[in-house]
Amino acid sequence: MNVLESVSQYKDRISVELNNTLTETELGSAKKKTGKVRDQYDLGNALALITTDRQSAFDRVLASIPFKGQVLNLASAWWFDETKHIIDNHIISVADPNVIIAKKCKVFPIEFVVRGFITGSTSTSLWTVYNNGDREYCGNSLPEGLKKNQKLVSNMLTPTTKEEHHDRPISPDEIVSENWMTQEDWDYCSKKALELFEFGQKKAKENGMILVDTKYEMGRDEDGNI
């Protein structure tokens, strides 16, 4: 079967399942937290993370797509398995194509955003900030003359806070001085974020793709391990 035939088969199957998507979940009496895409259930000694077919953009749910949850969940599980030599992760098991059973962790209130290119269109994107004239961003100094979509000389970590209403860009010095993280934890997590991104770039390149930017979240498990 060639690629075009394979794509056609997938399209046909998706068309049949357009009205059969996973948009809502219910897991008995377990305490539930609902995100834009994932539902989280507290199982006592672990968490059940259910990836639905909900499609979100710009902080809102727009639609649902057949099999999206399975693809996203299994892709995540694959990446976690591929990167466990860099840093441990929260996965206990993949209980279902849509479900991961995970360790409970206390998440650091910082999102580790790593960028390989100067691009984007949102108010917090690196290109928007740069195009507005800023040359200092999240503790990084940017040179003059950069063009949109240009590859950065080196990967850049641009952390943001995890706050209830609005995440804000923040520098490493501010992270420590404002007590978001200790210096030791920041040094370790920032190093691992850059290692993860470099590994992701390598894997993407091997498959004819580029990893432009991504976000990592980290935390401590009940044994104190990051």
What are these regions (language model features)?
Residues 114, 211-226:
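Conserved metal-phosphate-binding beta-hairpin within the catalytic cores
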